[in-house]
Swiss-Prot record:
Organism for this UniProt entry: Candida albicans (strain SC5314 / ATCC MYA-2876) (Yeast)
Membrane topology: Multi-pass membrane protein
GO BP, one annotated term: filamentous growth
Disulfide bonds listed in the record: none
GO annotation, cellular component aspect: endoplasmic reticulum membrane
Pathway(s) this gene product operates in, as recorded in its UniProt entry: Glycolipid biosynthesis; glycosylphosphatidylinositol-anchor biosynthesis
Gene for this chain: GPI11
Job of this protein: Acts in the GPI biosynthetic pathway between GlcNAc-PI synthesis and GPI transfer to protein.
Glycosylation sites (chain numbering): N111, N112
Similarity comment text for this entry: Belongs to the PIGF family.
The protein's name: Glycosylphosphatidylinositol anchor biosynthesis protein 11
UniProt keywords, alphabetically: Endoplasmic reticulum, Glycoprotein, GPI-anchor biosynthesis, Membrane, Transmembrane, Transmembrane helix
Transmembrane segments: 49-69, 79-99, 137-157, 166-186, 209-229, 240-260
């Protein structure tokens, strides 16, 4: 008689699947940003009240007092020159109000897209402060040229208005790029990493500098609205309302950050 064929026992192993799932979970957790990973590359502010750009109001009032609506180009240029030493003082106030960076975790180092971890030991004491502040002014002036091109591409009038638009870009570059350069310590990768964070707007409005910069852009954008209205007022000239919106937007952004931080605590 032929030998009876014994049925084979079927076994199912989940060990490989479980191990694969565990590996996938670990990789997913590595790719996710930690809740406060931005603290490892964006310095926080000691006293948010001190970095609110209230000086913007005085610069703006000074330009109107000097005849901004009568001699627009001359007053805008003189106002820009006047704002530079004021901005130098403001940059120093920002610098001395920056807290040391939080130490990076393993995941924060892995998520650094540039492939190099940020050295948190390079605190404020290791910086050449005059060089940093001077560089922020110079770089901001240089960046006013691409900003000028962007404003033109977004619909700014060109014929007979190019010089006024250039002066507008000079003012806006000081309001936008100057504080960001001090905050990032001339490291563009820090700003790039900021846009990869979850809850970006929550981070921005909890930070006095970032909130001021964002509302400067928003105020300038809203400043376009009164220009085409049929009111025939001298202050409706291009680009006075954009200039006013940018300067006041920075102040509103700083105050808004104070309010957000107050209620969040």
């Amino acid at each position: 008689m032929p030998a009876a064929i014994r049925p084979m026992k079927k076994t199912v192993s989940f060990s490989k699947d479980v191990s694969n799932n565990n590996n996938n979970l670990e990789s997913d957790s590595d790719t996710k940003q930690s809740p406060q990973s931005y603290l490892t590359f964006i310095p926080q502010i000691k006293n948010s009240l001190l970095v609110v750009p209230f000086h913007n109001i005085f610069i703006l009032v000074g330009m109107f007092y000097s005849g901004l609506t009568q001699d627009l180009e001359t007053v805008m240029w003189k106002g820009f020159l006047t704002s530079i030493p004021i901005q130098v003082i403001y940059n120093y106030i920002i610098y001395i109000n920056l807290l040391p960076l939080k130490k990076s975790t393993r995941n924060d180092h892995q998520n650094n897209s540039s492939g190099s971890a940020i050295n948190n030991n390079n605190n404020n004491n290791n910086n050449n402060v005059p060089l940093l502040i001077g560089s922020s002014i110079f770089v901001s002036i240089v960046l006013s040229l691409p900003l000028f091109v962007v404003i033109i591409l977004m619909g700014a009038p060109v014929y007979k208005y190019s010089l006024k638009t250039l002066y507008l870009s000079l003012h806006l570059s000081q309001l936008i790029f100057n504080p960001l350069i001090i905050l990032s310590n001339l490291n563009v990768n820090k700003i790039k990493r900021l846009f990869k964070q979850d809850h970006l707007y929550r981070i921005i409005f909890h930070h006095g500098i970032l909130s001021s910069v964002l509302l400067t852009l928003g105020g300038c954008w809203l400043g376009v609205i009164p220009i085409p209205l049929d009111w025939d007022r001298p202050w409706q000239q291009w680009p006075i309302t954009l200039l006013v919106g940018g300067y006041l937007g920075g102040v509103v952004g700083g105050v808004l950050s104070l309010i957000v931080n107050y209620f969040s605590h």
